[in-house]
Amino acid sequence: MNTWSTFPERAGTVVVGAGCVGCSAAYHLAESGREDVVVLDRGPLFETGGSTSHAPGLVFQTAGNKLMTEMASYTRDLYDGFGDFRTCGGIEVAYTEDRWDFLKRKREWGQSYGIDEGQLLTPEEVESRVPQINADVIYGGYYVPSDGKADAVSAAESMAEEAREAGVEFYGHTEVTDID
């Protein structure tokens, strides 16, 4: 961690927050060639006490529009490349007929957005994968085998490490009280 004696008076870009979102911003700014980037967080690096510190890290790739689906797939691949992702598949379960109709539409969206592996499961198929679910009370599920779980804090650290190597500076225990 940097000390106050090296704290810059100015920066071209300041990112507030060193969780997943802030570290991702810093990483992508560095990847795009941006220099003079500083990341500040009021908490310790990288378990800052914000959302990243207690996020479950579930990554479901199929979203309601193409851009969000592409972003989720990109994130999955990025975290996997850092070793911070565990592919275990993701199942969304329908307990109502309306939800089941929604999951059928979601599968169609996924296919049109490039998530070809998504599949609709019968109640029995859901129960065979998740024995805690009673097949008698559900309509079915939507399953994507390449969905999974990211270690959010490790992913933030991995992106920060790459950003640091590109010259981004990180300062923990640094609260932002005003912006000029």
Where are these regions (language model features)?
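Helical element adjacent to the flavin cofactor pocket in flavoenzyme catalytic cores
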Residues: 142-180
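Residue-level detector of anion-binding/catalytic polar loops
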Residues: 35-36, 116, 169
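Dinucleotide-binding Rossmann-like beta1-alpha1 core, especially the glycine-rich loop
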Residues: 55-129
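Glycine-rich FAD pyrophosphate-binding loop
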Residues: 30-52
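A short, basic/flexible loop-to-alpha-helix module at the beginning of a structural domain
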Residues: 1-11
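Short, flexible, mixed-charge acidic loops at enzyme active sites
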Residues: 49-56, 131-133
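Short beta-to-alpha linker loops that shape the active-site pocket of alpha/beta-hydrolase fold enzymes
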Residues: 43-45, 126, 159
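N-terminal Rossmann-like FAD-binding beta1-loop-alpha1 element of flavoenzymes
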Residues: 11-38
